[in-house]
Curated annotation (Swiss-Prot):
Source organism per UniProt: Arabidopsis thaliana (Mouse-ear cress)
Keywords noted in UniProt: Cell membrane, Disulfide bond, Glycoprotein, GPI-anchor, Lipoprotein, Membrane, Secreted, Signal
Domain of life: Eukaryota
Propeptide residue interval(s): 147-169
Family assignment from sequence similarity: Belongs to the plant LTP family.
Lipid group attachment sites (GPI-anchor amidated serine): S146
Function: Probable lipid transfer protein. Proteoglycan-like factor that exhibits xylogen activity consisting in mediating local and inductive cell-cell interactions required for xylem differentiation.
Name by which UniProt lists this protein: Non-specific lipid transfer protein GPI-anchored 11
Lineage, opening ranks: Eukaryota, Viridiplantae, Streptophyta, Embryophyta, Tracheophyta
Signal peptide: 1-23
């Protein structure tokens, strides 16, 4: 049951990343190759090495559409999924996959948030809004919202995906 939940969350992330990725690569299906990586990169996970087909899935994503990897990491917070950025950044070296800089998403293995990826901070929840430096610390700055059309297409894809998953149970 827990595996099905993790797979569902990862699939929704993949569907959302497909909305924003280049049209030449189908990120939604490509990221599903990395479903076994989620147990390793989820914040608070005690898994010490990637499981199952994680590394072969990572290799497929890096070879086919490395930008999809970054999109999945960036969109994970919108689903309430918090990632351990140190583990996420270490995936290529742990899996012995040569990843181009675009597949590293600006993440550093030390866990320090890079200047190029402010939405991926290990100190705040991945979905937490950023705080303005001049504002009261209790007042969050509104994040830009996606258009209603994009939200509708993700919702429709989610309904289709859930129907598919429920047919197996």
């Amino acid at each position: 049951m827990a595996y099905a939940t993790i797979l569902m969350i990862f699939s929704v992330v993949a569907l959302m990343s497909g909305e924003r990725a280049h049209a030449a690569v189908d990120c939604s299906s490509l990221i599903l190759n990395m479903a076994d990586c989620l147990s390793f990169v989820t914040s608070g996970s005690t898994v010490v090495k990637p499981e199952g087909t994680c590394c072969s899935g990572l290799k497929t994503v890096v070879r086919t559409g490395p930008e999809c990897l970054c999109e999945a990491f960036k969109n994970s917070g919108s689903l309430g999924l918090t990632l351990d950025l140190s583990k996420a950044a270490s995936l290529p070296s742990v899996c012995k996959v040569a990843a181009p800089p675009s597949a590293r998403c600006g993440l550093s293995v030390s866990g320090d948030p890079p200047a190029t990826a402010p939405g991926l901070s290990p100190t705040a929840g991945a979905g937490a809004p950023a705080l303005s430096s001049g504002a009261n610390a209790a007042t969050p700055v509104s994040s830009p919202r996606s258009s209603d059309a994009s939200l509708l297409s993700v919702s429709f894809a989610f309904v289709i995906f859930m129907a598919l998953i429920s047919s197996f149970y």
